[in-house]
């Protein structure tokens, strides 16, 4: 497989991985204040994602794949809010272990990586097009 096609495959795998990462971050942000459905029940638990390199046999290129989707087992945040329906008998409410600042940083990083992969695809496509034009002109 030629290097330009390999670059397209690598970038496409990066796009898929970052798209999944953005979805996970979005779910975490959307549920950052979700409490349990009963007093004392556990709230939403932050989701995590990890990536791994996979070698494409046809091209020998290292592709990115989602290795694992998991949950963050860190402690929940606890807040005193006796009026909350999810509050226990002491008025304490368990809140998700989601830190909005971390999620926003993850989102920006994933967005930049997504844009970089898009740019690589565009440049590879342009190079392929220019190569075809040169081959046509030489005939």
Curated annotation (Swiss-Prot):
Residues annotated as signal peptide: none
GO aspect biological process, one term: bacterial-type flagellum-dependent swarming motility
CC terms in the record's Gene Ontology section: bacterial-type flagellum basal body, rod
InterPro entries: Flag_bb_rod_N, Flagellar_basal_body_rod_CS, Flg_bb/hook_C_dom, FlgC
NCBIfam families, alphabetized: FlgC (TIGR01395)
Family designation: Belongs to the flagella basal body rod proteins family.
Protein name as catalogued: Flagellar basal-body rod protein FlgC
Organism: Rhizobium meliloti (strain 1021) (Ensifer meliloti)
């Amino acid at each position: 497989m030629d290097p330009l096609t390999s670059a397209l495959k690598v970038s496409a795998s990066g796009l898929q991985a970052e798209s999944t990462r953005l979805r996970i971050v979005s779910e975490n942000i959307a549920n950052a204040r979700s409490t349990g459905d009963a007093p004392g029940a556990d709230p939403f638990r932050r989701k995590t994602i990890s990536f791994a390199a996979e070698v494409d046999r046809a091209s020998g290129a290292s592709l990115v794949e989602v290795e694992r989707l998991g949950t963050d087992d860190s402690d929940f945040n606890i807040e005193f809010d006796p009026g909350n329906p999810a509050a226990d008998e002491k008025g304490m409410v368990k809140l998700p272990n989601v830190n909005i600042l971390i999620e926003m940083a993850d989102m920006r990083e994933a967005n930049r990586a997504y844009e970089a992969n898009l740019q690589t695809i565009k440049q590879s496509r342009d190079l392929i097009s220019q190569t075809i034009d040169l081959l046509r002109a030489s005939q």
